[in-house]
From Swiss-Prot:
Gene behind this protein: Klk1b8
Annotated Pfam families: Trypsin
Glycosylation sites: N102
Protein name (database record): Kallikrein 1-related peptidase b8
Catalytic activity from the UniProt record: Preferential cleavage of Arg-|-Xaa bonds in small molecule substrates. Highly selective action to release kallidin (lysyl-bradykinin) from kininogen involves hydrolysis of Met-|-Xaa or Leu-|-Xaa
The protein's role, per its UniProt record: Glandular kallikreins cleave Met-Lys and Arg-Ser bonds in kininogen to release Lys-bradykinin.
GO terms classed as biological process: proteolysis
Propeptide position ranges: 19-24
Intrachain S-S bonds: C31-C173, C50-C66, C152-C219, C184-C198, C209-C234
Length: 261
């Protein structure tokens, strides 16, 4: 199946059909070196397509809409376009998209209003375990939900401009607020469900963007979400982004890793 980057072009005035979804960081800053050691860069045929999170030495979590036929990943990177001694390259032996994600959406040229992107997560089993270092460390799954209003951190190598495709070299971080789900329900034309999180800045100027899909949303130092969808232009005022709510999927994630290790 061909890869389709997911990101919504949304407006409060509404549209007949949104183009394919995409995600990236705008309004952020260069992450401190090795401050996000769980961050993964996911590639398709040498092209960076998504972010991911290292959960265990053999397992990376990303978004289901990042699905392609073959993957490779880089761990321990701070700079996307430079060779680094800390970086580790791994192939992916098998991918496990969540069975509840509607994979047929990835074949569409346009995303229809009301499309349901629930269950947007996927596990990647690495062909060789990651070596744990200062630059490469797994992060644990959440045990409880963060409170609304919590400060969250999203990260990735997605575009740093709202409408043009401009990848940064340095890993980008951006602080966002965890918002009531109604903020996303009122401002997105796709279906918003209770397995999603809503985060952003209602004033605009900061958000995830193209290339950040599958990356982490960390709230109060706890991994709570995986980047799923957001607006174009990125950082549009009044339109937060949506993330897969990981606490809803703890059992599936753990069971899948256990049964396929």
């Amino acid at each position: 199946m061909r890869f389709l980057i997911l990101f919504l072009a949304l407006s409060l005035g509404g549209i007949d059909a949104a183009p394919p979804l995409q995600s990236r960081v705008v309004g952020g800053f260069n992450c401190e070196k090795n401050s996000q050691p769980w961050q993964v860069a996911v590639y398709d045929n040498k092209e960076h397509i998504c972010g991911g999170v290292l959960l265990e030495r053999n397992w990376v979590l990303t978004a289901a809409h990042c699905y392609v036929d073959q993957y490779e990943v880089w761990l321990g990177k701070n700079k996307l376009f430079q060779e680094e001694p800390s970086a580790q390259h791994r192939l992916v032996s098998k991918s496990f998209p969540h069975p509840g994600f509607n994979m047929s959406l990835l074949t569409l040229k346009e995303i229809p209003p009301g499309a349901d992107f629930s269950n947007d997560l996927m596990l990647l089993r690495l062909s060789k375990p990651a070596d744990i270092t200062d630059a490469v460390k797994p992060i644990t799954l959440p045990t409880k939900e963060s409170k609304l209003g919590s400060t969250c951190l999203a990260s990735g190598w997605g575009s740093i401009t709202p409408t043009k495709w401009q990848k940064p070299d340095d890993l980008q971080c951006v602080f966002l607020k965890l918002l009531p789900i109604k903020n996303c329900i009122e401002n997105h034309n796709v279906k918003v469900t209770d397995v999603m999180l809503c985060a952003g800045e209602m004033s605009g100027g900061k958000n995830i963007c193209k290339g950040d899909s599958g990356g982490p949303l960390i709230c109060d130092s706890v991994l709570q979400g995986i980047t799923s969808t957001g607006p174009i232009p990125c950082g549009k005022p009044g339109v937060p982004a949506m993330y897969t709510n990981l606490i809803k999927f703890n059992s599936w994630i753990k069971d899948t890793m256990t049964k396929n290790s």
